[in-house]
């Protein structure tokens, strides 16, 4: 029998299919399956392209399944699939493009590039900073992702979707392409692409079938990976919300501590190297003294970026959480614009637009200027950034959270955005807690303050008003039963004569008058201004208001009703005698005099600093100008009472303007604001000298409300300090009253606060009063009256008064210095004599001639 050839055996088996199947199952099936399952690699020759038998293809499939079972890394599994596909499709190269959404825009980025049958994973894995990114409207892969259909490009030169920029970048020529989307349900997850069919002009229909068949493995791998990733993200998000929620409800009082506790607690779940939180200033409206320089043209208006609700973007604090290397937290109050977390401009941009920004390659970013060098000694550099706004329930941006460098080196993806956004959104909503607490605390403080006011102050009652409006004695009825003409007749007989009492003079002294007489003088000023009839002020309300004001001032050493009246009297004198009334309307004059009378009502005899140190409810209620705002609120509280409201017959516009003028006037008495406004006032005075006629200047002044407000604010300061301008016999007494009140505060600081007071408030340094007075006159007071005397020469008597008083205080200060110098010289003489006597005593140690004095602690026998 001759030798049987392979062709004959193959022909026999093809003709006897049943026999071939029985023979294979009996002899080889168990061994093949056993060998296949036990093998570490498929027994297929990949060294050159060739057609595969069904057994070899089965081995490839089993190899892919085993790899999928044993390998948890999605990139490696997909890489193995692509290597096999390269061989099966006889493609020169394959690449994988991952679908993602960045800043709301879909795109494709290379994850595995230039995979071939002999490739190594590490060479094909694309680093985040080396990605090639395709938008969906560009290239064949973009078209595939957009259409969600397989694409077989026979000739790239004739295809409208082909883009050659990758060929130009890699110096490679793409002739034909076979690409298909990898789907998860209806969503595109990635696009896989094979290029350049080997030994054939293009990919065939058979290649499309092979690709789709083996793509099931890629689909399965990506789906499992995607579901695993989603599960991980949702788990992290749940943990973040759970832990941040626990810390949010632990801290209900302060937004900064609330954010800090929540963000620090969830740091392990954020999957980044570093993150920072910038807190925004929530101030929407500036104080008038900050607006004046802009309105006066002395400072340019703010032209920088603003939040969507119109606030100036000002990060008042940045909290930096460092998670790489040694963990650390840095809190930067009032960070400079060049701080590393702000210098790029990204947080400002996010605060301005309210958008989430995902920067995947920070060093290559053109729009934002990130630092390209290491930030610290550890060599840490910014690679990718995710920044988003923190928005409260009112849709106001309260801060910006920025996360740097995902830990696995990849850029932040859509799920990271969702996770971080959940945290930022939760923190934004949680701001409602400290806001509500602050509102409740504010109401509680108001309640405490008003309870204290009610205990101490009582408005003018029906018995007290009879001391001035003697309606029972004259008409036998109550004031509210009388006509206005009847009340006017009574007041005409009761109120003092303005000329006789000199209430319009700068040298007026309250010392000879009783407090009731001062109330009557105050009422008379309203008649002198001719505002009672013009604005239909009820005369009963006027009397009750002035009497209540006198009771509203506490019985303290200096800041009592007498001081309040003196400030009102000086305001009246400046308007009438100083001729400043020409710049103001009658309504404004009414508001200014009323504000002057109210300016220190319910003063406690201690200053603003003491309120803060003692943690007085006032300090918690008012952030700045603490006492001044309290005086203002107290005065407005009296005016809200119908029986005391002298503004009750003003129309709405007049009432709002009068209250506005009072707001500015009373707050302007805070000396802390004095140095802000005096330069502006000086420029107004200088400008007044450039006008030829008084009428032209007056018309110019009345055109601009801001100029009038600045003058009024400086008038309030001049009124508040006016005691320093009184005749010496009056001023010297008042100065002692001021000093006595200061010393009382110093005593409180010693006993209550356990602190040493400043020299001005130290009773033990009372002898230095003349020197302190001279310093106060030079540093604070002289400027006011010198400028007012330049502004209006009618006010010169006030400057003369302060000049004379300075001479008196200077003489006393010099006398004190002379006495102290004499005492010091006498003391030195006594010490010298005592040392000389000690040197002559037996056992003493006299110093040699011209030598040092003998030691006080050592004696040689």
Swiss-Prot record:
Residue ranges of domain PDEase in the record: 483-816
A Pfam match: PDEase_I
Membrane topology classification: Lipid-anchor
Subcellular location: Cell membrane; Cell projection, Cilium, Photoreceptor outer segment
SUPFAM superfamilies according to UniProt: GAF domain-like, HD-domain/PDEase-like
Domain GAF: 73-222, 254-431
Family annotation (PROSITE patterns): PDEASE_I_1, PDEASE_I_2
Record field: catalytic activity: 3',5'-cyclic GMP + H2O = GMP + H(+)
Modified residues (N-acetylglycine): 2
Superkingdom in the source lineage: Eukaryota
InterPro entries reported in the protein's UniProt record: GAF (IPR003018), GAF-like_dom_sf (IPR029016), HD/PDEase_dom (IPR003607), PDEase (IPR023088), PDEase_catalytic_dom (IPR002073), PDEase_catalytic_dom_sf (IPR036971), PDEase_CS (IPR023174)
Binding site residues for a divalent metal cation 2: 600
Active site residues according to the UniProt entry: 559
Subunit structure: Oligomer composed of two catalytic chains (alpha and beta), an inhibitory chain (gamma) and the delta chain.
Record family assignment: Belongs to the cyclic nucleotide phosphodiesterase family.
Protein name per the record: Rod cGMP-specific 3',5'-cyclic phosphodiesterase subunit alpha
Species in which this protein is naturally found: Canis lupus familiaris
Gene responsible for this protein: PDE6A
